[in-house]
Amino acid sequence: MQQRHLNRRQYFCELANTARTFYMEYLNTYIKLTPDTRVLEIGCGEGGNLLPFAEKGCQVTGIDICQSRIIEAQTFFTECHQQGTFICQDFLLTEEPKTEDERYDLILVHDVIEHIEPSNKRDFLLHIKHFFKQDGIAFFGFPAWQNPFGGHQQISVGPASKLPFIHLLPKPLYKVLLKTSGATTSKIGELMSIRVSRMTVEGFEQLVSEVGYNICKSTLWLINPHYKQKFHISPRRQWTFFASIPYLRNFYTT
C-alpha cells in the first residue's frame, strides 16, 4: 500500500491538486463556475476533488457512505478555511431535491462507478438524473477494469500491491496471492467486491446510453492526470487509433 493511502491529508491534497490542474480546465468548456454554481460529488471521500470548486466560490456538497471520510472532509475544509456541506449517506437512499434551486449544475462521480454493484449501477445512474438542474452536467472518471491496476490492488499490501494485471487472474489464485502478500480478510473482501463491480469503457457507454445520458466529451488516458501526483509522470491522452479499438483499449487505458 502506498503511503498516500495511509496519510489521508496527503491524499486529500493530491486530489485537490489534480482537480485544480486538470479537471477544472477539462470542464471549463461546458460550465462557467460562479458563486451560484452548485456542485455535488457522490462518493466524495475526504473532499479533495471539491476543494478547488470551493476555492472558486462554488456551493459544494459531498456525499459518502463512510462516516470517517466525511469527518475528515469537514476537518480538512475547516483547515483550508473553505465552506462545504458533507453528508454521510448511501446515495441511493438520498432524497431527491424538490425544487430546481436545490438541484446541481455539476455532479462529480470520480472513481465511484466501478465500486457500485452491477445490479445497482442502472438505478444509481437513474437516481443521479433527479439531482441535475435542467442544463446540468456530470463528470465521470473511472479506471478501465483490465488496465494494469484496474482491480485497485495498489490499496493492498506486500508484493501483490505492486503487481500489474494480477486482478485478471482466476479468482482463487488472485485471493491466494493477496493473502500470501499479507492482505487482511476485510481487504481481500473489498478487492473481491471491486472484481464483481468492475467497469469497462464499453460497459459504461452502453449503460449511460440505456438510461438516457448524452456523452458530450469522452477522453481516454494512457497516463491519466492523477498519475502526476501519484507517480510524478506527466499525463498523456490515449492515441486516437488505440483509443478506438473496442475491448482491447481497456488494457492500456488508465
Protein language model annotation of sequence segments:
Residues 37, 135-136:
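Surface-exposed loop/turn positions
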Residues 120-128, 137-254:
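S-adenosyl-L-methionine-dependent methyltransferase catalytic module, highlighting the catalytic core
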Residues 29-30, 131, 211:
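Alpha-helical structural context
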Residues 95-96, 116-117, 149:
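Activation segment
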Residues 111-115:
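Short catalytic micro-motifs in class I SAM-dependent methyltransferases
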Residues 117, 132-133:
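Helix-to-beta-strand junctions that scaffold the AdoMet/dcAdoMet cofactor pocket
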Residues 1-102, 106, 110, 122-125, ...:
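Conserved N-terminal segment of class I S-adenosyl-L-methionine
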